[in-house]
Amino acid sequence: MGLPWYRVHTVVLNDPGRLIAVHIMHTALVAGWAGSMALYELAVFDPSDSVLDPMWRQGMFILPFMTRLGIKESWGGWSITGEPIANPGLWSYEGVAGAHIVFSGLCFLSATWHWVYWDLEIFSDPRTGKPSLDLPKIFGIHLFLSGVACFGFGAFHVTGLYGPGIWVSDPFGLTGKIQPVSPAWGAEGFDPFVPGGIASHHVAAGLLGIIAGLFHLSVRPPQRLYRGLRMGNIETVLSSSIAAVFFAAFIVAGTMWYGSATTPIELFGPTRYQWDQGYFQQEIDRRVQAGLAENLSLSEAWSRIPEKLAFYDYIGNNPAKGGLFRAGAMDNGDGIAVGWLGHPIFKDKEGNELFVRRMPTFFETFPVVLVDKEGVIKADIPFRRAESKYSVEQVGVTVEFYGGELNGVSFSDPAIVKKYARRAQLGEIFELDRATLKSDGVFRSSPRGWFTFGHATFALLFFFGHIWHGARTLFRDIFAGIDPELDIQVEFGAFQKIGDPTTKRQVV
């Protein structure tokens, strides 16, 4: 049977054994890729600096997902949290990656077995001797089993009852660690940034799945509903499954891009909205003001700012700054961060403090403008010097650093002042090593950006797939061109293989 490439799945339409085989093989490919990719990432990952060179700066994609589920130790003798380790055992990065590869091999073997031994008695209707699947019953079984898994994850793994817990951190991504989480049963459980909601929602959704699964196992669908939704047609299963997948993909694209307790910034990097809203800048300013209120000097107050917090307040870590089609990790763009130079404070010749206007997310170039506390422009780097009124030279701008490597150092040379004013557009100023990786200086996105783009794109494609297959199964008789006035009863859909001569016909 010569089929075009876009119709090859016809061969498993009415062949339950081989339908199972191709799905097991798909699972083998997914698990094999996950395990292999994890081992590759472990081979290239440098765990030496979790503050300035975390996994998301290095372009790790699998490791953040493993870490958020409670894995933190490596057979290489390091821990993602920097704690000393003794014997990580199977519950480690390499152990879990290896388990996925072993599982992939077992799935490959079982897929091969089911492909060869496709004609099993279990797939035949004993009354007719023909292939038949009780799809509502199968739906009930799968719903029950997925409910058990969902409940078990929330009640045992996340809570630490039998498992490690999950990654939990503070709102500014400074104190993250693996810890058990108690379910949040109140209104706070609906806050996407409350980890307790992960436990409670998995428990609740799991119980709902178990109850719904038992319902579908014990209650048969009404005949009109069965026929109206084509519940006997395997393409109905395909359509509704695609719907579940695209819905989930849209949800996780949102929780990743906008941030949530499931996507901590220590593992996936900050969100673009944290730059847009000056989230870290406000927290840094709050801490500095608190230090000044304790009678600390400006230098001492800035020296207490964690380097990790300052690093988040840098536009190069904004996932929306990297183009979607610029391949590579963030480190391949602006380089590997080496150290925080400190916070620059600019002043004019009268001693008034000036603030560099920060670059908005969607600008590649932006005028360097310095404003006073009222927002009035006082200095800039002009495009045309002949017409300038506010140039650094004319206004007499100087810069002094507080905290960081240049703490207490000041500059009045206009060329140096302009250099740091340009860099202050991008947030806190860091020394970046572009030589080691031959970084090209062009910003890259973080795994947060890749994940969102991939899942939003495939969700859209799967949405159209759901519409396509749903329409095919609901309106199969119309699409097949069967005359509605036909007086011969055709049992259409019992055998759907192309050219099948055994479809029953019966004159009414």
Swiss-Prot record:
Its main location: plastid. It is found in: Plastid, Chloroplast thylakoid membrane. Keywords: Chlorophyll, Chloroplast, Chromophore, Membrane, Photosynthesis, Photosystem II, Plastid, Thylakoid, Transmembrane, Transmembrane helix. GO terms for cellular component: chloroplast thylakoid membrane; photosystem II. It comes from the Eukaryota. One of its GO terms (molecular function) is electron transporter, transferring electrons within the cyclic electron transport pathway of photosynthesis activity. Belongs to the PsbB/PsbC family. PsbB subfamily. PSII is composed of 1 copy each of membrane proteins PsbA, PsbB, PsbC, PsbD, PsbE, PsbF, PsbH, PsbI, PsbJ, PsbK, PsbL, PsbM, PsbT, PsbX, PsbY, PsbZ, Psb30/Ycf12, at least 3 peripheral proteins of the oxygen-evolving complex and a large number of cofactors. It forms dimeric complexes. This is Photosystem II CP47 reaction center protein. The lineage of its organism: Eukaryota, Viridiplantae, Streptophyta, Embryophyta, Tracheophyta.
